[in-house]
UniProtKB/Swiss-Prot annotation:
It comes from Erwinia tasmaniensis (strain DSM 17950 / CFBP 7177 / CIP 109463 / NCPPB 4357 / Et1/99). It holds the Pfam family DUF480. Residues 173-188 have a biased composition (Basic and acidic residues). Gene3D superfamilies: Winged helix-like DNA-binding domain superfamily/Winged helix DNA-binding domain. InterPro entries: DUF480 (IPR007432), WH-like_DNA-bd_sf (IPR036388), WH_DNA-bd_sf (IPR036390). Belongs to the UPF0502 family. NCBIfam families: PRK11239.1. This is UPF0502 protein ETA_20480. Residues 169-188 are annotated as: Disordered.
Length: 217
């Protein structure tokens, strides 16, 4: 497993920087105000947040300490920030444009299906087809720096399984697509208990009948 662990706000900040680095390069690196606006925008964000300047500033400072961002003093009074999460001069994590697109969108919107990712990643990377999306997810799941994404159990009524990033820690085991879910085991146990209770009740009735008939002394 990778060693990076982001809080929800840290994940939002890094996701915004990854996104804006590609979609609005003329506004990158980003100022505090730019990051706040990106974090709180209503489109392509799940959940929608209402972060304050101080909350975002504290998060930026923490990410700088974690060596995931660089604070740039460009000679003006405004400090600008650039991500060091991947493909930076000092970082070791190397990701393709397709991989960056998927990681950014998972950080910004949480778990999504390959079909959703193909549509939502279009502004960062235009996937040729679903095969490219699936191959990219597979590479991220087997990345040299540790597993970066995981396939979740398919939800009832859904055609596709969703994928989630692992940059905020392990996903709840009941959500993993490994075929072993606590709810399934609990359901099996409850069914077995009900069956045993029925068998006990049947035996008790049979014993009572035998006693009443005088067949048991």
């Amino acid at each position: 497993m990778n060693k990076i662990l982001f809080t929800a706000v840290e994940a939002r900040v890094v996701g915004c920087l990854l996104e804006k680095q590609v979609t609005t390069p003329d506004q990158y690196p980003m100022s505090l105000n730019g990051v706040v606006t990106a974090c709180n925008q209503k489109s392509n964000r799940e959940p929608v947040m209402s972060l304050t300047d101080s909350e975002v500033q504290n998060t930026l400072d923490m990410l700088v300490k974690k060596h995931q961002l660089t604070a740039l003093n460009t000679g003006s009074r405004v400090v600008k920030y650039e991500q060091r999460f991947c493909n930076s001069t000092f970082g070791q994590m190397k990701l393709s444009a397709a991989e960056v697109a998927i990681i950014a969108n998972l950080l910004l919107r949480g778990a999504q299906t390959p079909g959703e990712l193909r549509i939502r990643c279009a502004r960062i990377h235009d996937f040729a087809d679903m095969t490219e999306v699936e191959q990219t997810l597979e590479r991220l799941a087997q990345h040299e720096h540790g597993q970066l994404v995981v396939r979740l159990a398919r939800e009832p009524g859904k055609r596709e399984s969703r994928y989630m990033h692992l940059l905020s820690g392990e996903v709840d085991e009941s959500s993993r697509a490994d075929g072993h879910h606590p709810d399934d085991h609990r359901g099996d146990l409850e069914g077995r208990i009900a069956q045993l209770e029925q068998q006990v009740a049947t035996l008790q009735r049979q014993i009572a009948q035998l006693l009443n008939n005088g067949e048991v002394k």
